[in-house]
Structure formats: structure tokens, C-alpha cells
Amino acid sequence: MTPPGKKPARGCAAMPALEVCDLTFTYPGGVAPVLDRASLVVPDGAFALLTGPTGSGKSTLLRLAKPEIAPAGERAGEVLAFGADVRSFLPAESAAAVGYVFQSPDNQIVCDTVWHEMAFGLENLGVPADEMRRRVAETCNFFGMGPWFRAQTSELSGGQRQTLALAATLAMRPRLLLLDEPTSMLDPIAEKAFLGLLFRANRELGITVVVATHAPQAMAEYATCAFAVGEGRVREVELSALAKPRPLAALPARPAPAGAAAVDVREAWLRYDRDGDWVLRGLDLRLIRGEVRALVGGNGSGKSTLLSLAAGVARAQKGRVKNALARSQALLPQSPKAVLACETVRDELTEWAAGSGYGAAEVDAALGELGLTDAADRHPYDLSGGQQQMLALQKLLLCKPGLLLLDEPTKGLDDAARVWVVHAVGAARDAGATVLLATHDMAFVEAVADRVSLLFDGCLTSTETAAEFFAASWLYGRGSR
């Protein structure tokens, strides 16, 4: 058997990089297995796509191939990396065989500087100092990270943070790289740049790549094979058969609301460090009661910061912020785990019932709406990222907030789940809620927004109706939707 960190000798047939054999897995509290005798074979050197509906088991399958993050539960079958059972790997062998990149770099980056993050995993593996410096230098040069090598990780854009997560993983030189929705939080330009780097790692370094994604079309030009996960099984599909995203049906048209402001921001200046760059630079925002406003712009433009400012979570160093609906607001941050704090899915939806005037019937209906009735007794962290996103949003919606602040609410969701979010925002709008959302999903913006504000250089450079925005925009026109 070839050791996990070594290539087979010349003339020998290459083993599959990843082989899943009759894998069955059931989460604690689950009624049915998420994976049921699932099998697949990914050839060495492939760029493979793993597709399927939200909650189909894509993330579970990937995590079971990386023992350090494998979920707890009942398991049968085998997962092999280069012919070896992944559960037999020692830590150094696991790092040399299988690397893993999460959907959110915030779940992966643990150090305060780029250079320390690059060295962190190598230090834990006991790599000698000279070899560590060589690996860090080579990897940073490969990914063009020199200009921001000594930057604070908190100052990086979303694209840079995801590139750092990828580079720090590859510095450990795995032969197989698993990625779970790695571009779902990136703007279109950052997504293209990241996929280009990933493709280079595959082609130039010979690393086998397996990507779980709801947007296979963006990666089809790089892929060599694709698999669909559904009903517990895995089947290979033709790249030409990968479904294009369905258009999102827009909410019923209405005139953009006018009247009093729900949130009024005047001349706001905000930065996170005394000597850091200003994230918001004299920004003005007037959010009208009852409107749905979308914030768009590149990674690092300040969308999340503006949501935090409106919610009172962040404080401006200069300027004024008035929130007339502060007592009735709900914030969905980029990480849904910030909202999820209970032991079971059902408990999440009942946590705020007493103070919000709903009961068991509404909770049961919400579980059914989310397709989580059979998962009601599972731990929320055992759900897929998309299911966690929907659960967190549903938890907020049950409280009927007057102001709903949403940060990337459709990230990592399939078409059906995105449609659910459109309807959820529409129901909140029709109930009189004011909605401020930040997103890279332009089809979602077109479906739900009354007005669109573009952030650039710390300011809102334009605010117009959604129809006006898409008619006038070159970058965000129909080509991006």
C-alpha cells in the first residue's frame, strides 16, 4: 500500500484519491440515515464536484473523509484515501493525505496575522523551522500573498480570508483537498479569482480536488467529473447535465415605500482599530419603514459592518445612528451558529416562544416548512450549513421582528431553499417589517428588493429602485444573475 503522503511509483496504477464504499451514517437523534450505502470513486488528480439539495449529505460525506472533524453518529462502511482507511491515519498522515477548507474562513482561521496562520498548522505537526519557512514562502508566492503576508487577519477581505484558508491548508501539502461551499460568501470577482487559484493547485501541483457546491456551473470549466448526492446515495453525473440555477420569481411588485425612517445613519465613520483604515467613511443611510433594502458591493466593502452599525452591535467613532425599531429588531449574521444555542432543532424554535406569543403548533408548522420534522431531535450543529441558515432565519421570523437585518441570507442554499427565503422575506414585508439585507446574490436582490444601495470606498455611492439599479448597472446586470 502506498503511504498517504507519497505518490505511487512510476509504472504502478494510481489508486483512487477518494473511495467511499457502502457508507451509511445516521446522526444522533436522526430518524433516518443521511447517507445510506453511499459509494463513489474519485480518481487521483481529478477536480470533482459534489452537488445535491440542501441537507442531502454533501457536507457529512466530506467531513467523514477527514477524521478530525468527522461528525458523531452511527456509521457503517468505509472511506479510503489513497487506499487507506482515513480512520487509521495518525495526525501527520492525515494532514499529508487530506486537507479541508470550510465554507466560512471564520471557522478555520485562528491566528491574528497572516504569517502566523500560515505557520500554525505546520507548528502543530512539528515541522522543522527551516522546512516550515520554505513551505510558507513557496505557498505564499504561489498564491500571490506577498503584499499582505504581514497583515492582520481581521483586516482581510472575504476573498483574501478564503485564499488564506486555502493556502494554510495546502502548506501542509495534502494530496487530496476537500472544500465545502468555498465560494458561497464571495462576490463574483473574488469567486473567479479563488477558483483560478484552486484550479492551479489542481493542475500544477497535482492535488485532487473535491468541492461540495450548490453552484456547479461556476466550476464546470475546471471540473473533470461530478457526483450528485440525494436520498442517501451518490451517483455520477455528466458535467453537461449540471442544472443551471432556476430564476427566482419576484415578489409582487409595489411602489417603493416612502415616509418615516426606520434607521437613519448620518456621516458615520467607523474603523475597528485606532490606526486601521476606515471601513465606513462619512456614510449616510436612510432606511424607510416597510421597505426591503439590499446592500451590494464587493467583499470588504463594509456591508456587514453597516448591518452591525444599524443593529447597534458596532459603534461609529463619528456620526449619528438612530434606530426607531431597535426594540423589535432581529439580526441574522453571516454565521448562523451565532443564533443557534440549544441542544436540539426543536428547542431552537421554542426558545423564544414564551416572550413572542407562539406555541407548539407554530413550531411544528415551522419544522415542516423547513423539512426538518425528522431532524427535530438532532443537534443544530449536525445540520448542513444551509439547513442551519434556514433554521436560524426561521427562529428569528417566529418572533415577528419589526426590523429584519440579514447578512448573506441565501449563501450555501440550493434553488428550492432560496425560493423559501424569498417567500420568507415577502411574508415579513407583507406583515409590515422593514428589511435591510447584504448579499452577493443578485437574483435574490432582483426578487425581493424595493431599493438597492451600492457600497464602495466606505460610502453608499448610489441608492435607487431595484429596476433602476439593474437597468443602469453594467457589472450587476443580467449577466451576473
Per-segment meaning from a language model:
Residues 152-156, 160, 379-383, 387:
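Conserved ABC ATPase signature
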Residues 74-85, 319-329:
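Conserved ABC transporter NBD signature motif
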Residues 177-180, 404-407:
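Catalytic Walker B motif of ABC-type/P-loop ATPase nucleotide-binding domains
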Residues 213-214, 439-440:
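H-loop/switch region of ABC-family ATPase nucleotide-binding domains
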Residues 187, 414:
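ABC-family nucleotide-binding domains
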Residues 233-251, 459-480:
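Conserved beta-strand-loop-alpha-helix hinge in the C-terminal portion
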Residues 131-148, 358-375:
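Conserved ABC ATPase "signature" region
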